[in-house]
Amino acid sequence: MSFDVPAEAYDRFMGVHSRQLAPQLLDLARLSSGDRVLDVGCGPGALTAELVDRLGAGSVAAVDPSESFVAAARARHPGIDVRLGAAEALPYDDGVFDASLAQLVVHLMADPAAGLREMVRVTRRGGVVAACVWDHAGGRTPLGSFWHAVNELGLGARDESHLAGAREGHLVELFKACGLRDIEDTQLVARVEYSSFDEWWEPFGFGVGPAGALFQTLDADQRARVRARCLEFLPPAPFEFVSFAWAARGVV
């Protein structure tokens, strides 16, 4: 999969949905004024922006393995500490944050268990770890129609339903396994309006994430067939895309 893409590509592909989830994840985390918070896998900064609005730039740090996303997050939020790094090896000392959050990231970690253990490590005792992942197993995501079409047409690709946290209860299992306590889980909902089918379809060509990576392997005929099936699955434009994410909160 690839996230070595311009920030604007991610914004159009997934950022429009991420911005809907960010305030809900922060509500679940129940942060307090003065908390020092880390955004793990920050991307171009959808969750980061919400954190800055609520807590101020001086209370927020962010990290991402994509150089282009780190550059974008730094440009958009010049007052915060944004570092290049992977979730599995966070470039911070033990217990330096009051909370560590990961929005739409756990399922994309190379080693989700290790990434969550690192989030626990850098969070103080009594602090909070929270995360959310699309309900890929239920197909209720911005990508559901695409994966449905790909699977129906037998294009030989594995969708994202098997990934960490992408089914009900799995984030809770992962949180328990890394020692978190007082765990809560819930669903988050994102509602995004599209004025045309192509507004939803075209960003797949940007090569973002597993779906975008697969799209780039398809030839012109295969892309046309997937597009035709997606047109049948989705309502006439304009339409609202309603997506669901599983979310969990635990205490260190």
Task: Please report, for each region that a protein language model flagged, where it lies by residue.
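A short acidic, Gly/Pro-enriched loop at the edge of an enzyme's catalytic core
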Residues: 88-100
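A short SAM/SAH-binding and catalytic strip from SAM-dependent methyltransferases
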Residues: 99-112, 135
